[in-house]
Amino acid sequence: ETSPYLPAPKNVEVFSYNFQSLLRWSPVPVENGSVVYTAHYKTGFYDTWSGMGCAQTPQTWCGFPPELRRRRWTIVLRVRAERGALASAWAHTPPFVAETNTTLGPPRVNNVNASPDSLLVSVSPPFTPEPGDILQYLVSYWENTTSPTEKKLSESNTLFHIGNLKESTLYCFSIQVQLKIYSGHFLEGQPSAPECHRTALS
């Protein structure tokens, strides 16, 4: 039975990073004893709630099961607190769509090779791309001076040149990924930490 004495979980939210998602919430305070939690999900227009593999768990989070890995699905989640025969009201999340609601991290810079007039940069995307993904890498770069001028370029390959540079000069760059999503918009990732490399002497 639903109990007015057992409050529903608060701060219920989906945390999603690089398409790895979990439901989390704040612990429900009780005077004595322990509380467990049960979480459900439903997708799209279906009215049926399904278990997430988190029934009567003491944890205050629940990872998405594999069937919820579809990026374009609209998902609603709910969680309640339970204590013995008592259950709280359900607390619901707003609709979640991974393709627009996830946070993309920075790409990984694997290698940088310096020549006199360019830097050859090798990167990896922050998540495992799916077939058909269109990814771009936005590169901001600048000479490491007191008043630098930032330049930008956009690349679709994971190996690219930053060109037209001066020899034996320190240049810095930061890279962020853009994923083209269904609506034609781009989901922008977090920029990588700036790193600096000196071009070679000719």
Show where each model-derived region lies:
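N-terminal Sec-dependent signal peptide, specifically the hydrophobic helical h-region
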Residues: 1-11, 34-44, 49
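Proline-enriched interdomain boundary motifs that mark the N-terminal boundary
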Residues: 4-13, 102-112
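Short beta-strand segments within Ig-like beta-sandwich modules, predominantly Fibronectin type-III
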Residues: 17, 52-60, 149-157, 188
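Hydrophobic loop/turn residues within beta-sheet-rich immunoglobulin-like superfamily modules
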Residues: 17, 28, 67-69, 165-167, ...
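Conserved aromatic anchor
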Residues: 19-31, 64, 112-134
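Structural signature of extracellular immunoglobulin-like
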Residues: 24-28, 37-42, 74-84, 122-128, ...
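Beta-strand-rich modules
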Residues: 57, 61-90, 160-185
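Extracellular fibronectin type III
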Residues: 84-104, 180-202
